[in-house]
Amino acid sequence: MLNFRWSHGSGLPSVGDVTTPRIALVTGANQGLGFALVEGLGARMGPDDLVLLTGRNAGRVADATLRVAAAAGTRSRVEDRVLDVSDADAVARMAAELDERYGGVDIVISNAVARVTPDRPQSEQADEAIGVANGGTHAVLRSFGPVLRPGGRLIVVASSLGTLGHLDPRLHPLFDGATLDEVEQVVESWRAAVHAGTAEAQGWPRWLNVPSKVAQVAAVRAVAAERRAADLCDGTLVAAVCPGLVDTPTSRPWFDDFSRAQTPSEAAGAVLDLVLSDALDPATYGELVRFGRVLPWHGGTPPRSQDELLNH
């Protein structure tokens, strides 16, 4: 473990006797897991800290922010920001604004997704789903990585489906050891194949979620490979997380058994335990982490039941 010095358990880095307020940002945060992550940060961070709740719908973002700010357990300041993560320029502007105003950010959780359902052709949903989940991940990693303060946390919410074993072995070399530029190229090639109707012949699953999640984890691994040495020296964590099965409208169409599913608040708790830990386990750096444990990058088997839903 690498110990990172915090001030009196408040989740704040301290320099000498001076405590620096922390800046946290969560994307896709007006509902579901993202909202619960903001709630949890607001409750667990200090009164001088700032949590930014972001999303692309101004009205929903403002309403969600008011609800968190008014909650009895909220300790930190909570503000709303409109941010469409599929717009890379908008993400870059947000990062630059926070860098100029606050000297960087301490916690960034990339959580935004677009809902995908089995009752519509996957090709009709591909552009929005890939643009938000993968384009958003790439933009957040590129823009917020450089403004992350020492000891910070740059986290991408992915899934246990994000390990290579969930893909056809023919596709593994496309992601294994890839740079971020290469991951982006693979994602665009896959998107084009989905629209051309050739994706399945190339080995891609029908269900968009699987390649999307693998690409998210590959993107995190690519960025982490470049930063690892410097980040581990100052206690900075770049990682992907799997929150486990969460009972949300996004998950409901794809799974049958929700008997062990978590509420968004329950799922957020484990994610925030990692984010707010005062010690960094180097084994988690650049990896996909579920409930504090690393999921092997080459693990998993291709899911069948979800693709079968798309046969009807």
Language-model features: locations:
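Rossmann-fold scaffold of SDR-type NAD(P)-dependent oxidoreductases
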Residues: 27, 105-115, 133, 151-159, ...
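Catalytic loop of short-chain dehydrogenase/reductase
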Residues: 114, 118-122, 127, 153-232
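Conserved Rossmann-fold cofactor-binding substructure of NAD(P)-dependent oxidoreductases
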Residues: 86-102
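Rossmann-fold cofactor-recognition segment
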Residues: 71-89
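C-terminal helical subdomain
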Residues: 139, 240, 248, 255-312
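A glycine-rich helix->loop->beta "capping" turn
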Residues: 74-79, 97-110, 116-120
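Glycine-rich NAD(P)-binding loop of the Rossmann-fold in SDR/ketoreductase-type enzymes
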Residues: 86, 128-136, 211
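Canonical Rossmann dinucleotide-binding motif of NAD(H)/NADP(H)-dependent dehydrogenases/reductases
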Residues: 17-52
